[in-house]
Amino acid sequence: MISGSNTSLSIGMIHFKAGDTDGVSLEMDKWREVFQSQGHTVHFCCGNPPMHADGCTVLPALAYVGEDARALNRGTFETLDDYGDATAYSQAMNVAVLQLTEDLHAWITSSSLDVLIIENIWSVGLHPAAAVA
């Protein structure tokens, strides 16, 4: 509930993965417990299937372990060898960003979110297209 009101919120949390034993996944589980104890609904969105069934909507384009995401990571931080030139890299990045943006927008809309919490996607440079989307 919002302090002093009876309003329940629909809260979304996004990360590359959820339901795992890494620090971010564990913190997301803690946050969910707190939010739910206050009467809110919590929705998880992740790129990799969770280790346990926790109601996470899986968006494969959000996974950082796929070859497309790894190639974008290399192109952003190391070399354009996977693409040949900057134009091809930019086109691949734009396609990935558009796909993720569409997928995330559909999830946000279908979950009727009031609040969106983005976990580490902007602070960990594993999936540049996810950071842009």
What are these regions (language model features)?
Residues 4-21, 115-122:
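Nucleotide-activated donor-dependent transferases that construct or modify glycoconjugates
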Residues 21, 51-54, 124-127:
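Short catalytic/ligand-binding loop motif for oxyanion handling, primarily in non-cytosolic enzymes
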Residues 24-35:
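Short amphipathic alpha-helix
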Residues 129-133:
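Charged helix-capping and loop-helix junction motifs
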Residues 7-8, 34-115:
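A conserved catalytic-core segment of Leloir-type glycosyltransferases
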Residues 89-91, 120-123:
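Surface-exposed cleft-lining segments at the edges of enzyme active sites
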